[in-house]
Amino acid sequence: MTSARLLELDDLTPAEFTALLDTATAWKADPSSIPQLLAGKGAALIFEKPSSRTRASTEMAVVGLGGHPIYIRGEEIGLGVRETAPDVARTYASFCAVIAARVFDHSTLEEMAAAAPVPVVNLLSDQAHPLQAVADFLTLRELCGTLEGRRLVYVGDGNNVAASLAFGAALTGVELTVASPQGYELDETIVRQARNLGGVVELTSDPHEAARGADAVYTDVWTSMGQEEETALRKVAFEGYTVDEDLMATAGEQAWFLHCLPAHRGEEVSARVIDGPRSAVWRQAANRMDAARAVLAHVLTLGGV
C-alpha cells in the first residue's frame, strides 16, 4: 500500500522498497546528491523508550536532508496520560514536516498516523522495527550483490525485529527462516501476512538445521527492553541458540553474521563471531543512517514536501 507513513514494511510495495534501497545506496555513494527536502523544516523525534543507534542515525538523517531534529522524551509529553497521541501528533504537525516515534505500544503510532496531516515514521514499537530492517536488507544487498533467492536465517526471539525481517523478505524475494525455542516463535499472524505478500517464511526450533547454506545468520538479544524480569527464564529457554563458531560453520564459509545491537557476548552471540572476519555488524550499524535518510525522503515525497 502506498502511504505517506512507514509504520511497518508492509506499508511499502516491493517496487517502493527496492527504490528505497536504491536511494540509500546512491546517496551513500554521493552525499552531494542528497536533496534538501527538510531545508528550513523541523522533524519531531519522539522517544518513549531509550535509544542509541536509532536516535543518532535518525537525527543525522534529518540533518542530511537539511532539517532540524527536535528530540522529545516520552516523559516530557506523557503520551496517553498527560496528552493523547492524536493531540500530540496534531500539535507537532503544526510546526514539523514529519513525526518519527519510538513507542511502547504500536497502537500509539496508528493513532498518530490517523491524526497527523504530516508523515509518521516508526522508530520502533513492540510490533515492528522497520528502519532497522531497511538497514538490514541494504547491508545484505551490499554483501551479496542481489537479494532475490538469498537465504537469511534469524536465530532467537520472534520479536519486532524478526517481524520486520519477515515483511522485508517478502518484499525482496529473500527466503527467511526463523529459529526459536517453543513459546518464543514469530507470531503466526505475521508469518501469514508475510506469506500472503508472496514471502517464503519458515519457522523451526533447530538453529543448526536452519543455518545450513545461509547467506547470512542474524540474531538479537534474548531479552528486549521492558522484559528484564524475564531475563533468567529466557537464558534457560534460549540455551543452545547462541550464534557461535559451530553454528556459523554449519551455515558455511559464505555466511555473514548480522546483529541489530546492542549485543551481549556470550549469550546470543559469541565474541569470536561478532568480532570475527564474517561479521558485518558495524557496516549494518552504519547503514542505519542511510536507511533512515531514504525512508524520510520517501514519506516526505509522498506527503508532498
Predicted regions and their residues:
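Positively charged, low-complexity intrinsically disordered leader regions
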Residues: M1-A56, M60, A128
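Phosphate-coordination loops involved in phosphoryl transfer and adenosine-cofactor binding
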Residues: L37-A43, E148-R150, Q254
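Short, structured coil segments at secondary-structure junctions
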Residues: L65, A115-A116, T172, L197, ...
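Rossmann-like adenosine-cofactor binding region
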Residues: R195-R272
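Adenosine-phosphate binding glycine-rich loop
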Residues: Q254-A255, C260-V305
